[in-house]
Amino acid sequence: NVTIPYKKEIMDQLDFISDESRKIGAVNTISLENGKLYGYNTDYYGFGLMLDISKIEVKDKRAVVLGTGGAAKAVVTYLQDKGVKELFVVSRNKMKNNWSGEVNLIDYSDLQSLEGDLLINTTPVGMYPNVGKSPVGENVIKRFEAIVDLIYNPRETELLRLAKLNGKKSCDGLYMLVGQAVKAQEIWQDMNIDNKVTNIIYEELNGEFN
């Protein structure tokens, strides 16, 4: 596995880069296959698993992504690949647009009047130990159908608490964490891992965090 700050730099050393990694511009998993180095981004697959399990639809939806870091790039790439209708990325510096494809870069003041189907937090706001904070207020949350927070500690962030309070469909990032790790094992072992195994790992970690 590869972590920050080497996810981008390592790409020049690889013989093969997967499609999702090339689009994202980062690799987090490397496999040695027949003497060649292959790079993948399993965050992409982990995010997809999380949405599938939570029954959150992407195709033809209007989505807003909070944050512009590495996780945001994986999320944006997945949304684009799965046919999102309209996509907004919220940044504190909307003049710096490094996004490919149809991405609308806006700032937090623009968000106050925006409505959509899916709101995804990729920022660390609300993560342990700085709990009790939300990247957006209820006035924003009320204008979306589903709220996703990639944070998994705490299990219920302030953002998710407010989402549930307003009757919104919501999910945290624990299944993404598990899903990306399982995908890495599938690559290394060259095998498909049954979803039952993924669920067992999830339940084990769920018990640890609760």
Outline where the language-model segments fall:
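NAD(P)-binding Rossmann-fold cofactor-contacting core
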Residues: 82-101
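Adenosine-phosphate binding glycine-rich loop
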Residues: 150-210
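Conserved S-adenosyl-L-methionine
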Residues: 81-86, 165-169
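Rossmann-like adenosine-cofactor binding region
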Residues: 101-170
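Glycine-rich Rossmann-fold phosphate-binding loop(s) that bind the pyrophosphate
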Residues: 67-69
